[in-house]
Amino acid sequence: MSQESNDDSLGIDKLSVDYDYLLYKIADYVSSIEFQTNQICKRQNELITKDIVNGIVDENIKHFREILTKCEKLENYFDMLDQINMITENFKTRLAQVARDYKELQKP
């Protein structure tokens, strides 16, 4: 077994990369939601100031529903983070037990 495969036999590097990617996706979603919300609000303000309101309410509701869908996806990502936290806590506990068992095996 090479040193490299031995160093990451538990897949910690992959978990770390997956975790970083999940955080990136969350940040990207937040930025996207923020941008879309600002755009809709600016557009709504323009429409109100120009008295062009006919038919716009339904379109705005559609856009806000799209944002709500993105918020739900964002909530799912946060749920994934919670699951990762539970997995890592469980992993730490199991790893500590393995270390204790190993020490017991080393006793004469």
Curated annotation (Swiss-Prot):
Q: Name one GO biological process term.
A: endosome organization
Family membership, please give it.
Answer: Belongs to the BLOC1S4 family.
Coiled-coil regions listed in the entry: none
Gene that codes for this? Answer: CLN1
Q: Which GO terms describe its cellular component?
A: BLOC-1 complex; cytoplasm
Name the principal localization, coarsely classed: cytoplasm
By what name is this protein known?
A: Biogenesis of lysosome-related organelles complex 1 subunit CNL1
The compartments listed are: Cytoplasm
Q: Taxonomy-wise, where does this protein's organism fall, top ranks first?
A: Eukaryota, Fungi, Dikarya, Ascomycota, Saccharomycotina
Relate the protein's function as given in its record. Answer: Component of the biogenesis of lysosome-related organelles complex-1 (BLOC-1), a complex that is involved in endosomal cargo sorting.
